[in-house]
From Swiss-Prot:
Organism expressing this protein natively: Homo sapiens (Human)
Sequence motif Antp-type hexapeptide, location on chain: 133-138
Biased composition (Basic and acidic residues): 245-255
GO biological process, one term: anterior/posterior pattern specification
Protein name: Homeobox protein Hox-D4
Any one GO cellular component localisation term in the record: cell junction
Source taxonomy: Eukaryota, Metazoa, Chordata, Craniata, Vertebrata
Disulphide bond pairs: none
Single annotated GO MF: DNA-binding transcription factor activity, RNA polymerase II-specific
UniProt-listed InterPro entries: Antp_homeobox_Deformed_sf, HD, HD_metazoa, Homeobox_antennapedia, Homeobox_Antennapedia_CS, Homeobox_CS, Homeodomain-like_sf
Alphabetized UniProt keyword annotations: Developmental protein, DNA-binding, Homeobox, Nucleus, Transcription, Transcription regulation
Name of the coding gene: HOXD4
Family listed: Belongs to the Antp homeobox family. Deformed subfamily.
Length: 255
């Protein structure tokens, strides 16, 4: 009772809301039409088809954007589904646009040529370049000399004397420590060696013999003798000049 009297006596204004019928008839929802929800014209038992019929390629060109000028777009409703990414909505009975045709399959030869680089030959036909061999990479010995090799001086190999050759050379060295040219040639032919090998062996054997007998080297002795002779020649003139200086000094004192 108190609540109703307060609302009557107060200046509270009762809001005037339009009835539901007027709101539906003149409002935003009424402008959409009776078939906005897609069930007024077709009935409650309408079932949209599950699969759209696929048209032939002759009916509609590739990449069609929509229906012709004579056809009208149906009203948008909840019972319709979008027809494509371009914003075109197709009715359930309207055929959807044809998907793009797949590109033609290339030929096997053309595919292989396109994948491979034309500048680079295939791996099977790649030409193998020969390895570059420089002169310093070649190992040449005296026994196996390449006649076509025109590089630097060939490297000499160490001669391996047999037991019989060493025995004959030791026997010859016991009688003669120095060989003549004629005797060296004879020994070289007998032992199947070269004159150079015989000469080098005797030089090494003489050095070993001097070392065993503790004899001075002939080269060192010759150098020491030459140095002593030069010293004696330089001292002799100074000794000769000393008496002459004394005589000259006595002459000056007498005057």
């Amino acid at each position: 009772m108190v609540m109703s009297s307060y609302m009557v006596n107060s200046k509270y204004v009762d809001p005037k809301f339009p009835p539901c019928e007027e709101y539906l008839q003149g409002g935003y929802l009424g402008e959409q039409g009776a078939d906005y929800y897609g069930g007024g014209a077709q009935g409650a038992d309408f079932q949209p088809p599950g699969l759209y019929p696929r048209p032939d390629f002759g009916e509609q060109p590739f990449g069609g954007s929509g229906p012709g000028p004579g056809s009208a777009l149906p009203a948008r409703g909840h019972g319709q589904e979008p027809g494509g990414p371009g914003g075109h909505y197709a009715a359930p009975g309207e055929p959807c646009p044809a998907p793009p045709a797949p590109p033609p399959a290339p030929l096997p030869g053309a595919r292989a040529y396109s994948q491979s680089d034309p500048k680079q030959p295939p791996s099977g036909t790649a030409l193998k370049q020969p390895a570059v061999v420089y002169p310093w990479m070649k190992k040449v010995h005296v026994n196996s000399v390449n006649p076509n090799y025109t590089g630097g001086e060939p490297k000499r190999s160490r001669t391996a004397y047999t037991r019989q050759q060493v025995l004959e050379l030791e026997k010859e060295f016991h009688f003669n420590r120095y060989l003549t040219r004629r005797r060296r040639i004879e020994i070289a032919h007998t032992l199947c060696l070269s004159e150079r090998q015989i000469k080098i062996w005797f030089q090494n054997r003489r050095m070993k013999w001097k070392k065993d007998h503790k004899l001075p080297n002939t080269k060192g002795r010759s150098s020491s003798s030459s140095s002593s002779s030069s010293c004696s020649s330089s001292v002799a003139p100074s000794q000769h000049l000393q008496p002459m200086a004394k005589d000259h000094h006595t002459d000056l004192t007498t005057l």
